[in-house]
């Protein structure tokens, strides 16, 4: 889709938007400092050479009421974030062209050793107080932050003595009020404070109906990766706290989240040639429905005046179990003639991961040199992940153990009474990955018979068998650096330049399970070396009077990046290639002469390329599985008295993917790979929401896809160009009515 100048001008006159999270709470308490816990410092964001957004509670609840999840809310507000797939799996969803680290109170939810892409659905938004976004590669939270950090901060301790809490009731319906499209949600949070002790307990339950597209057809199901539609989700949450002194506090926080598919529908193939999307019909899919379960417990002790500084400590345990659904047609990857005749064997997989970790940091102004603030810290993480085939109890991805020990230091020097700040730091990562000897699935060595094979080449069922792989303990250690300069010539106006390095482990599971050659030794297997990426950034921010504006140019590279490419069936494999990404993000929001009305606009342009032939030079565009489209965000918000409202439009701009393989495919009259079909056509979607505060709670009415626009989602439009079971339309007009009461 291309935006003409008249369309942009006329739309801008009506709407405006911002990618930066609204700061309603901050505006209500303008003098209260904003502390971003994900940045590992109590210094305000303006003192850091980073692009940071904080999505406050009101904005988050508003967006969740429209779209249904924290992930959708963040993707809507952030132009450089990929549009979500509206599925349980977030595979291919990126921030600035790389995978972000999802965290809850700093506890990593991502499982990079075998990325099940379920990390966006590990807690219900009902229990999230705010979301902190740090953009670009960094190692502030350790492994996983190559695209940035999405830290979900849960509800805080109660501030008033006695009993308080919150209740939520919500109903959702599609445009034509189909009986199978109805959904509902109920949540309750109860808090009690008695002197130094406080307790919080809560539960949330959500039943989602089937989604319908803009042409009143059921949105297709991805049985394997999982769905949020036709599902039930439960979340239990608890927090216990005790103030040991005026400045010291102990907190114990626990959460259990589970989302399960109902298993009432099966997929109906679409037709890419005619533009007919995948749909769904009543039926019972085989095996267990796709599901996601996450359990976490964290114990922390903080003291804001420990030896004159701020001390933070945390130990945590996190366990997840991601069940991938089965397909009606047996999956080729799981076939093994030693178990059952080929094309008759049913199976499905499940990721199992558990983490144990600890974090410590101490921050204070240096005695005798108060302009210099220093932070010393140490992080430790143990992660064990495997992927099993649960119908036949086979191992698909062998258990992989990850161990990280990381001391770090950060400094921030205030010069010329705050006119200039110089910040910098280092983190030493010492990592070990352990994988025992294992045997790959039988299908990894399968060769299909074809007239094109050289004479005498083994093929057919005799080639099933897999290979034995020698395990090992590859190690990695590196010093990850960051630094930057901030200049603030006037209050509310600042410019900054920064450099930061981040790292993550590649998807070791995808790599390990795909080995199909003998003689492989994990200790010397290049493909499992960690991904080290850097982020260079130049930015300007203006927050003065009615204006809230920012602009940032960023570029990053990684010599051994990670690229998802289609494999056997609908599975994706990993390739390690050099990757370079650059982009620009601009946001503007302004108050208007109309009291309570704010307008703004957000724009992001991102280019990403990789080295397709290992010559050290990037030559091919990253496709839609690996990078987001360019986008314009527009919205208008209104807040006055008991009434608040928003109208927002997201324009996802068309994109053509170029490279040698695409050029060769286009030059072939038969177009065997159909790579041109992966070009993105673009689309736009408008949402709206209105809220009124009554004397007994607030009423909110929200509409997703206000004009019932029919479109093919970005992920479907840019991958698997011959797969008619993975051609999904986006959700059509959807109504949500909610009642929210705090006491």
What are these regions (language model features)?
Residues 37, 41, 71-111, 135:
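Extracytoplasmic beta-strand/coil segments of soluble accessory domains associated
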Residues 107-137, 188:
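Short acidic/polar hinge/loop motifs at secondary-structure boundaries
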Residues 123-168, 742:
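A beta-strand signature from Gram-negative outer-membrane beta-barrel systems
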Residues 168, 374, 422, 546-559, ...:
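Gram-negative outer-membrane beta-barrel transporters
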Residues 178-213, 217-264, 293-295, 368, ...:
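Transmembrane beta-barrel wall of Gram-negative outer-membrane proteins
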Residues 300-304, 310-329, 486-488, 494-513, ...:
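Membrane-embedded beta-barrel scaffold of Gram-negative outer-membrane proteins
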Residues 503, 593, 651-667, 691-743:
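C-terminal beta-signal and adjacent terminal beta-strands/loops
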